[in-house]
Amino acid sequence: MTQIPYIDEALNATVGCSGRDCKCRPTCWAKGDHDKRHKAYLAGKKMPLQYAKPFHEVQFFPERLERALHWKKPRRIGISFTGDLFDEQVPLKWIDDIMAVIAECQQHQFFILTKQVKRMAGMLREYHIHNNTFLGVSICDQEDADTKIPDLLRIPGKHWISIEPMLSPVNLRDYLPIETIGGVEMEPWPFWIVIGAESGPKRRPCPHEWMIAPVEQCQAAQVPVWVKAVSIDGKVVHDINLFPKELQVRQTP
């Protein structure tokens, strides 16, 4: 099981991230959790082996991939959500092992998310991207959108975009099939968009208006959108029933 609500399972075969091009670094939940456990490990407490090393040293645990081979019921599986699968430290052999499991488990859907979309494009050039694979990019603002989404859409396969944490307004119209609101119709376009406010004690504000705009654009384009978390009265809220009506949307591809 996983605490990430839009997937059923997380296979964290890689752990860690170098932090390059990481606007979310101050509040990264994966880094914060790992840092606390790494500190406990160094203090002599009994902890899983992955916490022996700091978060900026990317590690590989290929044995974790075997779980997917034993699940018969179809599941939505996130790959390496406790790091960046296409971090500069990750060798092609690790990618090869992961893609082999994905190819063997056609009953599942696999969701890959990276900030290093150019490296993902280069490393996946020689692979056949199966229909059960969703390749995603993590963005935080319009600069990210305009520099990373075009590179994502050039990779063969299905695509998704995570705007989390959302740190400023993001206009998706140029990347969605919405001629009626000025977008450029293009194919392939994203199959799915996830949007979420920043969490953690150092979180930055995310007004509802920022989130409403891309939600409405996705709805106009009939692209599924999932609103994960909203800032309400200074608190991060995950209960969809407490969201503003315009943001009570949780769709899957």
Task: Annotate each language-model stretch with its function.
Residues 231-253:
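C-terminal accessory extensions appended to soluble enzyme cores
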Residues 9, 13, 152, 234, ...:
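Short linear motifs in intrinsically disordered/low-complexity regions
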Residues 59-230:
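Conserved AdoMet/S-adenosylmethionine-binding subsite of the radical SAM
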Residues 1-76, 84:
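N-terminal [4Fe-4S]-dependent radical SAM core
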Residues 4, 25, 47, 53, ...:
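Intrinsic-disorder/low-complexity coil detector
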